[in-house]
Regions:
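A sensor for short, sequence-defined functional sites
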Residues: 2-308
Length: 308
């Protein structure tokens, strides 16, 4: 962690030269244990980031060693709920870094289904916060844009003919992506079987164990919004449709809503997922397991189109 500290000291010096007040925010990384309230020892501290005075009472946070972040967008290992802001002199206070930014993924798909089961369309996606940071990291560590697009096409099982980004190299909280794609649905006699989400939130339950002895810790809170507009081919009608879903965790801090509707030859899906709780105790695990099980099953449900 020596390099990180050196860079943040340099950053604070540069901010001071520019007349911008800044302070060290000392902490113990999430992987190294929680900093105790009752007896916070210097020996428990192993890194720090920079707090920049935004107003008289608020700070924004920055880690100068991170190349893909932004103001308040920190590496998850530094997003602790208990850090100490050393404001100056003998002044200091506790700060919570666990939810400093909004981590959002918003995607809109507009596509047309052809009688041979091909789905042609566009996807426009906005990545915010941690999603933008992750997208930039993957894009910039790929050998080139072709490799990145090929990996995306393979992961989503689509053919991509156009790929564009906005903000990929900017110091910005947001990255935008646009793709033109083609995807093959399943055709059997007079029926077309397709997943109406086209691009899934999750294919399977990430929690496979029936019991858990240790807590579940999420890296950050998140929000996912998927909107899909599909045009049904002429001469076809909807034969089977998934049911709507709204499910919450027992404490209400996790939620998923899935709505689907047909109007004329238009099929519309609106999907929202929110997760704001970062730590689930072993006693809460069965409810969390069921929550994700239902979400994964809903993500894999299909629409059946029937030829008239």
């Amino acid at each position: 962690y020596k390099r990180q500290a050196e860079i943040n000291f340099i950053l604070m010096s540069m901010l001071k030269d520019a007349g911008i007040p800044s302070f060290p925010i000392v902490m113990s990384r999430r992987s190294m244990g929680i900093l105790p309230y009752a007896h916070p020892s210097i020996q428990k501290l192993n890194t720090f980031i920079v707090g920049i005075a935004n107003t008289d009472s608020t700070l924004v946070y920055l880690d100068g060693s991170v190349t893909h972040g932004y103001l308040n967008v920190l590496p998850p290992v530094l997003m602790v709920n208990r850090a100490r802001a050393i404001i100056g002199g003998r002044q200091s206070r506790w700060v919570d870094l666990s939810q400093t930014c909004k981590n959002q993924l918003r995607s809109m798909v507009n596509a047309v289904i052809s009688p041979d089961g091909k789905i042609y369309g566009s996807r426009n996606t906005s990545y915010m916060g941690q999603y933008a940071s992750t997208f930039r990291k993957k894009y910039q560590t790929a050998k080139d844009s072709t490799e990145f697009v090929n990996e995306l096409a393979s992961k989503e099982d689509v053919k991509i003919s156009v790929f564009n980004t906005q903000g990929i190299n900017k110091f910005s909280p947001q990255v935008k992506e646009t793709i033109i794609f083609e995807k093959q649905a399943t055709v059997n006699d007079n029926f077309i079987y397709l997943n109406p989400l086209v691009f899934l939130h999750t294919e399977k339950n990430p929690f496979t164990q029936t019991e858990r002895k240790l807590p579940v810790e999420y890296p950050y809170a998140e929000q996912i919004t998927l909107s899909v507009n599909l045009t049904i081919p002429e001469g076809y009608t909807v034969d089977e449709l998934p049911e709507a879903l709204q499910i919450k965790t027992e404490d209400g801090q996790g939620m998923c809503r899935y709505n689907i509707a047909v109007q004329g030859n238009k099929l519309t899906i609106n999907y929202i997922f929110n997760s704001s709780k970062l730590l689930y105790l072993p006693a809460e695990y069965p409810g969390l397991h069921h929550f994700w099980k239902v979400i994964a099953e809903k993500n894999n449900e299909t629409v059946v189109l029937k030829k008239l």
